[in-house]
UniProtKB/Swiss-Prot annotation:
This is Probable beta-glucosidase J. It comes from Aspergillus fumigatus (strain ATCC MYA-4609 / CBS 101355 / FGSC A1100 / Af293). Belongs to the glycosyl hydrolase 3 family. Glycans are attached at residues 330, 447, 503, 764. It comes from the Eukaryota. Residues 411-579 form the PA14 domain.
Length: 865
């Protein structure tokens, strides 16, 4: 990097640089130069810095044919750990991964709120609770910054659904905005001072977030005193002068749409002053300065790490995120079903057993160094000879990716050949050998999901070009195979020269590729085992598509294609086979759930149900084997109509590289579960508070539940959900006693000088080491409140590891303002009302709750962090 990368460069140096910049150079600095890099000014030593997605791994600069990376458990999994030290360590790992990818800025964490269970990106965020979200984000950011990399809080604010996300206006009261949706950002900024904040795609009360002065100028920078950079989400800038004047420093990606000549015109017409321009430039230069701590050169090559210590940390995180929802007694032994016995034969059933559901979809997805399925994790622990598998049913939304099962024609390597052309294929079809085109690029690939947003080649100047995918497929057994082709563009799939899938002539809009692609079109073909069947795809990029314009979605240039396939399954027969095996098995694990097919950026789920056939499978297995252990993988709640029948039940999320090992570690007792639900699991979709007002209607979504999000709604209305926020069992037992609450400076005029010190004694009353999570809630005055408030709200938490019989005092300090205040819309400030509050300390298990009174002596109004 150039001279500006000197650590500790002072404000005077930036002032000097600004004075030497030309007007054109200032304007150029305020937008990206390409998908992932900022603009450089070599003559002044201002380098380009690189950004990368986030939030659960550092992908690097390529969606298309990228370099593999470490994948962390998803956001809800990390939230479930309630472990700030662990999240800090994972932040350090992310920083190391960023440096390996040559990146200076990580686009994470995501700290939007899951106001309902259907949000496509719900898995990315930590929790439905703003305090848990904000404190977890502070730990995440601190860990990333400890490694010299800049984290980015996203998305400011109310990016809580994917439906029409760039067009929808979130209509939310000032009180709910402050108490629920902005509070995670407020706490994360207070706790970590991250170097960047990303604005959301949507409008907030009628105005896009990236040009919203009330959010950026008044709250973020004015009230909170935030000094970092504000950057747009990718293609999330919608104006020239309005965005600059509101405080949006950096438009991404490049080339610019709203800066460049358009901003020069705004300057010459006094729509934007040079003073404001200099303010935006200063923030970009400060971001470059801060990013220099990573010690990463400009445009550094991307490489892999995959270190043993990282794999160990990822395995720990996967195991510690698994929530034990139920663990009833085995009727024959009168002991809890879990942990299982590794000496017994284990039957593993279900669609997720042999599936590596390691991350959700969209910008959080990445090519992992490796993945571990639950079946593999169990087999590695118990020995392959001790594990039997039965499919039961499929769980995919789109057919499993075919790429790694193909072989190249030329060398027989795993994968396929991807050729790129500037000209369309001949009318007769390029697969017939009449193709006289010369490819401009030829790549060997294994991932048959090819998103071309960041693909580039010197001979390709626009978004319109063509490609072929070619390889052979040798099926393990004869039978009917189903193939699927999804495109943002056009595509034809041929098997042995026969057209099997036409996704060109007639196309149907779907949710693929961030909402700009088609549904998966499918076709069938009988294939013979041991025979090499020729697989060929003709593809045209997004401009060749026959689909109409997609309203409310982001268009990512050239589009992409996805090729899947598998043996066709008769679900009824497969379920019956699984049931027959389960009836005779020593112990049974049923792995079900969702995957990145079902939960992804670009679309919301239409319902909470598990994939077709799943509930039938679970019910049938439980009917013959009531002690079967059910493992659910999902990033957000799913319906479990069989939950009351199940005696042993785990929520395992998307566990990253080590997902399967983490599940196996908990199943067999190598990890004692300590995780708690960071989300409420309703019994059915209609029970959740956002049910009537989740989708965009005529360009708006009404946040009708107001402040009663998640458990606040269920506690206040007295409705019992399927599983409560904070629920999670352990193989150990714990006892809480001696709760004390002490207030410092109770009469201080400035409430920021006052805090609560909550102390409780925690004992491990079992013979097994285990970790207890103490949750601290505050109940407002029952009669004296001037506004309606939730029955209780989480205000702090602490996790403590205890040996058998060990007792420790756990102390949690909470700012009094955070503990007692609500947002008073009348005075546009936080108000802590005097009165009698109650502090609850909640531990694992029914009845493990202590309550102590707290008297707030004086009412106080406050603002800021």
């Amino acid at each position: 990097m150039g001279s500006i990368d000197t650590v500790g460069m002072g404000q005077r140096a930036i002032d000097q640089i600004i004075s030497e910049l030309s007007l054109n150079e200032k304007v150029a600095l305020l937008s990206g130069v390409d998908a992932w890099h900022t603009f450089a000014i070599p003559r002044l030593g201002i380098p380009s810095i690189r950004t990368t997605d986030g939030p659960n791994g550092a992908r690097g600069t390529r969606y298309f044919n990228g370099v593999p990376s470490a994948c962390l458990p998803c956001g809800t999994a990390l939230g479930a750990t309630f472990d700030r030290d662990l999240i800090f360590s994972l932040g350090q790992l992310l920083a190391a991964e960023c440096r390996a990818k040559g990146a200076h800025v990580l686009l994470g964490p995501t700290i939007n709120i899951q106001r309902g269970p259907l949000g496509g990106r719900g898995f990315e965020s930590f929790s439905e609770d703003p305090v848990l979200s904000g404190l977890a984000a502070a730990s995440y950011c601190s860990g990333v910054q400890d490694g010299g990399v800049v984290p980015t809080l996203k998305h400011l604010v109310c990016n809580d659904q994917e439906h029409e996300r760039v067009a929808v206006s979130a209509l939310v009261t000032p009180r709910a905005l402050r108490e629920i949706y902005l509070l995670p950002f407020q706490l994360a900024i207070q706790g970590a001072r991250p170097g960047a904040v990303m604005t959301s795609y949507n409008k907030v009360n009628g105005l896009h977030a990236s040009e919203n002065p009330g959010l950026i100028r008044d709250i973020l920078r004015g009230e909170w005193g935030y000094e970092g950079a504000v950057i747009s989400d990718w293609f999330g800038t919608y104006s020239v002068a309005d965005a600059v004047n509101a405080g949006l420093d950096l438009e991404m990606p490049g080339p610019t749409r709203f800066r460049g000549p358009a901003l020069m015109h705004a300057l010459t017409s006094n729509k934007v002053s040079e003073k404001t321009l200099n303010e935006r430039v200063r923030k970009v230069l400060e971001l470059v300065q801060l990013a220099s701590r990573a010690g990463v050169p400009e445009y550094a090559p991307e490489r892999k790490l995959n270190r043993p210590e990282d794999r160990a940390l990822l395995r720990r995180a996967a195991g510690e995120s698994v929530v034990l929802l139920k663990n009833d007694k085995n009727d024959s032994t009168n002991s809890p079903i879990l942990p299982l016995d590794r000496e017994k034969t284990t039957l593993v059933i279900g669609p997720n057993a042999d599936l590596a559901a390691y991350c959700g979809g969209g910008s959080a997805s990445l090519l992992a160094y490796y993945t571990v399925t639950p079946r593999q994790g169990i087999a590695d622990k118990c020995g392959a000879e001790q594990v039997v598998f039965s499919q039961g049913c499929y769980g995919h939304k789109e057919l499993p990716l075919l790429g790694e099962h193909l072989r190249t024609i030329e060398t027989g390597q795993p994968g396929y050949t991807f050729r790129v052309y500037t000209e369309p294929p001949p009318a007769s079809g390029s697969f017939k050998g009449s193709d006289s085109r010369t490819p401009v690029d030829e790549l060997h690939m294994t991932n048959s999901s090819a998103f071309l947003m960041d693909y580039s080649h010197p001979q390709i100047s626009g978004d319109t070009y063509y490609a072929t995918l070619e390889g052979t497929f040798e099926p393990p057994e004869s039978g009917v195979y189903e193939f699927g082709l999804t495109v943002a563009g056009t595509g034809l799939l041929y098997i042995d020269g026969v057209l099997v899938v036409d996704n060109k002539t007639v196309q149907r809009a779907g949710t693929s590729f961030f909402g700009i692609g088609t549904v998966e079109e499918r076709g069938e073909r009988y294939l013979e085992a041991g025979k090499k069947h020729h697989v060929f795809v003709e593809f045209g990029t997004a401009p060749t598509s026959n689909l109409q314009h997609h309203h409310g979605v982001v268009s990512f240039g050239p589009g992409g294609l996805r090729l899947g396939g598998c043996r066709k399954l008769d679900t009824d027969t497969a379920i019956q086979q699984a049931v027959q095996s389960a009836a005779q098995a020593d112990q049974v694990v049923v792995c079900v759930g969702l995957s990145g097919d079902w939960e992804s950026e670009g679309f919301d789920r239409p319902h909470m149900d598990l994939p077709p056939g799943t509930d039938e499978l679970v019910n049938a297995v439980l009917a013959v084997q009531p002690n079967a252990v059910i493992v659910v993988q999902s990033g957000t709640p799913v319906t479990m109509p069989w939950a009351d029948k199940a005696k042993a039940l785990l929520q395992a999320w998307y566990g990253g590289n080590e997902a399967g090992n983490g599940i196996a570690d908990v199943l067999f007792g190598d990890v004692n579960p300590s995780a708690k639900l960071p989300l409420t699991f309703p019994r059915e979709l209609a029970q959740n508070p956002s049910y009537l007002s989740y989708r965009s209607e005529r360009g708006r979504v009404l946040y009708s539940e107001d402040i009663y999000v998640g458990y606040r709604y269920y506690d206040t209305t007295g409705q019992p959900p399927l599983f409560r926020f904070g629920h999670g069992l352990s193989y150990s037992t714990f006892h809480l006693r001696d709760l004390t609450v002490r207030e410092t400076a109770p009469y201080a005029a400035n409430i920021k000088e006052s805090s609560l010190r909550v102390s409780v004694t925690v004992s491990n009353t079992s013979a097994r080491p285990g970790a207890e999570v103490v949750l601290v809630y505050v109940r407002p005055p029952a009669a004296a409140c001037s506004v309606g408030r939730p029955v209780r709200e989480l205000k702090g938490y602490e996790k403590v590891m205890l040996q058998p019989g060990e007792t420790r005092e756990v102390s949690i300090t909470i700012p009094l303002g955070l503990a007692t205040s609500f947002w008073d819309e009348g005075c546009d400030a936080w108000l802590s009302e005097k009165g009698l509050y109650f502090v609850e300390a909640v531990g694992t298990g029914e009845g493990n709750t202590l309550v102590a009174p707290l008297t707030v002596q004086v009412s106080r109004v406050w603002n800021g962090l």
